[in-house]
Amino acid sequence: LFNHTTLIIIITVIISLLAWQNKALFNRLIFYPPAVNNGQWDRFVTHGFIHADSMHLLFNMFTLYFFGRAIEGLYQSFLFGYGFVVFYVLAIIIAMIPSYLKNKKNASYLSLGASGGVSAVLFAFILLAPWEKIYLFAVIPIPAILFAVAYVAYSIYADKRGGSNINHMAHMWGGAFGVIATIVLEPRVLSHFINALLSPSF
């Protein structure tokens, strides 16, 4: 079934493939603070549609495919049916803001990938189904809520440690946006989450 999750994946794959073939396009779309400071604010969005390599793209798109389809219906009643698309794009933008503020004058800072948006989708799913199994490395079953706790803890640790090209801060803020935006749009989700959390099912 064709849905907005599938549409986002198709667009992301096409743009990522084109950017790999065209270095000038890749450099124009990647998040680069000096360029943003010069008025290229669109990079807050465009960086989320390119990826470093095929594994980076595959991991993000597989995660988006499985969890996006599961939660997309919740947002369809908003913004003339485009609520999920807006939710996803806003997550990419908002997840990058803390990194931008931290690296505003850093001419060597670069960031790319859909991780902020994908994290928002993943955490919105966890809010709706906290005890649903998430398969770590595609084989190890772990309850969604435990995965969320470990994910946040690791993101904070890895961000403080540094030395990696992965934007762990964007993962964390994307996840936070996913939770907050979902509760704002549908406040009943919070009581559903609490009730589900208190009634674990394994």
PLM segments and residue spans:
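A detector for small-residue-rich transmembrane helices and their helix-helix packing motifs
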Residues: 1-202
